[in-house]
Amino acid sequence: MKLLAVRRLFRIQRVVIRYRLDDLLFEQPLLPWWLASLRLLMPWRWLPRKPTELSRGARLRLALQDLGPIFIKFGQLLSTRRDLLPTDIADELMLLQDRVPPFDPQKAVALIEEQLGAKVGEVFSRFDVEPLASASVAQVHAARLKTGEEVVVKVVRPGLKPVIAQDLAWLFLIAKAAERASADARRLHPVEIVGDYEKTIYDELDLLREAANASQLRRNFEGSELMYVPQVYWDLCRPKVLVMERIYGVPVTDMVTLADQRTDMKLLAERGVEVFFTQVFRDSFFHADMHPGNIFVSTVKPWSPQYIAIDCGIVGSLTAEDQDYLARNLIAFFKRDYRRVAQLHIDSGWVPAHTKVNEFEAAIRTVCEPIFEKPLKDISFGQVLMRLFQTARRFNMEVQPQLVLLQKTLLNIEGLGRQLYPDLDLWSTAKPFLERWMRDRYSPKAVFGNIHGQVEQLPHLANMARDLLERLSQPHLNDPQLPERRRQGDRWALRLLGAGLLGGGAVLAAGAAEAASLAAPAAWPAWLMLAAGLYLIVRQ
């Protein structure tokens, strides 16, 4: 194992020298003098090297490609962090392709038989030895079940964990060295990024997780005209083997075939946006790897086109609070209400509470005002989010993994939509959805549902307050004034109830007031909470 690690180190070093990645480090202006002086000790610095016309982004991309699949996937993850990376590097890393030669089909068969506990011929009436596709983590074979259904069988590459562990160790080492060496590198949080990648890559090795994600997504879009997700055959799924329905469709990037079958491209592009917002705001569960290779279009109804999604290894979800703040941020942004955007970032906890709202507002205005020089249809939602995150990053915004996945997915959907239909107006397509979502969120039914949930918690709050006051009075159990102390405790508990109702009513009223501009119903349930809270406080 140690010998393999040393060999890997020499390979990494050779690639670094070949693509002059050492120049990227030593060009840093704030590099400590002792580290900068190490450049003189590197023997290859004194050897003649051919000048390169490649950009720094291209050199980094080619180096990652040379280092193999684990580094390629890491580069793909990096490309989604546009809130951290310079644009030229992020654009180059987007070009990385996760394509590797297939492994021995007999090893795939052996692994399937080991996982299923049965011979391939006992499970499938046909199994194609030649793989349909091959990537760094797994490869896919076509097959037919004994019952006649056409399926695909996804198999994890054998012996992958030791390779991943070794490459991750080197990535962590490089990240830690970069953090110590450069202030700019520290701002990018490389160790944190490698940590995120470690979780992602190990999650992708568990195909049961992917199967569960696919089942959830299929259930969410059951009977929908927007998107179809293939069926998972759970009886044949194991940690290293996934069996699911084989789909037949047109790759979403095959414009010629889509045009030949007279697909409604405008509707297809708009439905892509609707799929995104449905996943994010209705389901709070979204496919986070919607690049063109994972998206197909059904051939059944070209006049009412339906997407087909595969490969659900990476998904994201948002809390109700994240959904709410995201919707309000988008609405406030398109109203050019930058103070509201700044305040929402602070209220949500995305930036520290001590952030000066005026300074944050000014920074957002400086970055975002130029965007509105374009027509609304030319404004990129993904770019808006990216610029907001970049600005917030300067004010110590904490990394929100779910928002990073969201931004990546939105950029994919948006790019795809405009490729299908260049005149796609994302805001006009999204606005009705956001209006409907805000209206439903603050409808009387939804508000009463929230009140019901809060009311269920009120007895617990009262009991907790009373118990606390009784514990505080324990040293005085023989005190003749104990009954009066208990009555005081009850009054304090009711005051706390009143304060809770008052606060909850204020929050609901504020939300409903904001939704009112989007044609939401009146917020009278919130006023009931405010009145009840005020009554309890005054009465006690």
Curated annotation (Swiss-Prot):
EC identifiers of the protein: 2.7.-.-
Gene Ontology terms describing biological process: regulation of ubiquinone biosynthetic process; ubiquinone biosynthetic process
Localization terms from the record: Cell inner membrane
Catalytic residue list: D289 (proton acceptor)
Enzyme class, first EC level, given as a word: transferase
TM spans (from-to): 24-44, 496-516, 518-538
Segments forming domain Protein kinase: 126-494
Keywords: ATP-binding, Cell inner membrane, Cell membrane, Kinase, Membrane, Nucleotide-binding, Transferase, Transmembrane, Transmembrane helix, Ubiquinone biosynthesis
CDD domains the UniProt entry points to: UbiB
List of residues binding ATP: L132, A133, S134, A135, S136, V137, A138, Q139, V140, K154
Membrane topology listed for this record: Multi-pass membrane protein
Molecular-function GO term, any one: ATP binding
UniProt GO cellular component terms: plasma membrane
Family: Belongs to the ABC1 family. UbiB subfamily.
Biological role: Is probably a protein kinase regulator of UbiI activity which is involved in aerobic coenzyme Q (ubiquinone) biosynthesis.
Name of the protein described by the UniProt record: Probable protein kinase UbiB
Gene name of this polypeptide: ubiB
